[in-house]
Curated annotation (Swiss-Prot):
Its main location: membrane. This is Modulator protein MzrA. InterPro entries: Modulator_MzrA, SecD-TM. The keyword Oxidoreductase does not apply. HAMAP family: Modulator_MzrA.
Length: 128
């Protein structure tokens, strides 16, 4: 009798494993897909002006109690990501006071492809 049930059990076990794996993947990717982070972009508005050091910006914003998700250079700008819109707005206000004239600081609208890649990224983002 066990010989008769063996093919049925293996197919059933396989189906259960596929369903469990699918459920696990769904649970893993749902938070990543619906993550809503905001970003600021700092650009030099004049030729010859160098961007501020990312670590300096991190230290100053951290001293103000603003939590930063990541700071990365992007072409000729510095992109700072935050978990919430409130953190981003507070950081923009602090950066306007902190950085001298000659820098454009503003909210960054993520493009469709980079936003999708950001949402699909499973790597933990870090500062630095």
């Amino acid at each position: 009798m066990l010989a008769l049930l063996r093919p049925y059990l293996s197919t059933r076990v396989l189906c259960v494993l596929v369903v469990c794996f699918s459920a696990l993947m769904l649970v893993a990717f749902i938070p990543t897909l619906f993550r809503n982070d905001t970003a600021l972009q700092i650009r030099a508005s004049r030729q010859g002006t160098t961007l501020p050091d990312g670590f300096y910006v991190y230290q100053r914003l951290n001293a103000e109690g603003i939590r930063i998700k990541s700071i990365t250079p992007d072409n000729d700008s510095l992109v700072i990501r935050f978990d919430t819109e409130e953190q981003s707005m507070a950081a923009e206000k602090v950066l306007h006071q902190l950085l001298p004239y000659g820098f454009d600081i503003g909210q960054m609208d993520p493009s469709g492809s980079s936003q999708l890649m950001n949402r699909l990224s499973l790597r933990k983002q870090s500062v630095g």
